[in-house]
């Protein structure tokens, strides 16, 4: 880290400590929209970022209507991204549970987003082509625990009657899941765009609470720093692009 960047970061942390005007910051963009990069930006800005695996573990209970673990988790840090914040309409609950918070909707070109989803998942299973991904790959994934990824994936994209509410697809039965839609581009992009639009509608009239940003094209953290009320000196800090797929 060069001396100038170190000074900018120190100024940001000092500003947050002395005059922070918000409660929490939630990255609510879907997976593969720059959420890892956003976590790095939060750290650069002097925010304590919630542990991602701990956050993912709260998804399981929150989908079933139990928010106690999610609340306890959020109380112990400043900024969050990925699951469960990238899922469905959890942003509505967060807005009610943590007043005066800020929300960042990370977006990217829908076609690029879908290709990134396929590449990431194929790589996870050692496949050369995303078209080789099967229901069995998803169901047998051991990440967190067996069944975690299958539930999350089905919940996000494969519901027979998708309403994108924060409930568990598995609670309404396996027959509610349309596995034949697995990585169907049109279905996935529709779900992606539908959720983004629901976020925009919910925060309409509250521009101070929602920032929408394409992390793949942003060259600096200027927009995020301005949104959080950080010093102008951070406007030239480069965007720390991470985990590209």
Task: Set out the residue ranges of the language-model regions.
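Intrinsic-disorder-associated interaction segments
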Residues: 2, 63, 137-138, 217
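PAPS-dependent sulfotransferase catalytic domain
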Residues: 2-188, 194, 198, 205-208, 219-226, ...
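Conserved short-loop catalytic and cofactor-binding motifs
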Residues: 26, 187, 212
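The conserved 3'-phosphoadenosine-5'-phosphosulfate
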Residues: 54-62, 104-115, 133, 177, ...
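Intrinsic-disorder/low-complexity, polar/charged segments
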Residues: 66, 185-187, 244
């Amino acid at each position: 880290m060069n001396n100038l960047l170190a000074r900018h970061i120190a100024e940001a942390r000092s500003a947050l400590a002395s005059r922070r005007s918000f409660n929490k910051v939630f990255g609510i963009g879907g997976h593969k929209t720059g959420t890892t990069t956003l976590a790095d930006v939060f750290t650069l800005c002097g925010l304590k970022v919630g542990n991602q695996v701990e956050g993912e573990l709260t998804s399981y209970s929150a989908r079933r209507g139990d928010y106690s673990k999610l609340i306890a988790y959020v109380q112990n840090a400043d900024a969050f991204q990925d699951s469960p914040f990238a899922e469905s309409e959890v942003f509505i609950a967060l807005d009610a549970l943590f007043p005066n918070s800020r929300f960042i909707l990370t977006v990217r070109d829908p076609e690029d987003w879908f290709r990134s989803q396929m590449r990431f998942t194929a790589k996870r299973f050692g496949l050369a082509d995303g078209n080789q991904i099967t229901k069995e790959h998803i169901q047998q994934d051991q990440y967190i625990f067996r069944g975690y990824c299958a539930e999350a994936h089905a919940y996000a994209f494969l519901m027979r009657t998708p309403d994108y509410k924060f409930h568990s697809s598995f609670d309404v039965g396996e027959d509610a899941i349309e596995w034949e839609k697995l990585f169907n581009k049109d279905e996935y992009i529709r779900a992606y765009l539908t959720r983004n639009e629901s976020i925009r509608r919910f925060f309409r009239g509250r521009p101070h609470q929602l920032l929408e940003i394409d992390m793949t094209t942003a060259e600096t953290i200027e927009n995020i720093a301005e949104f959080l009320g950080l010093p102008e000196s951070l406007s030239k800090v480069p965007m720390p692009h991470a985990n590209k797929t």
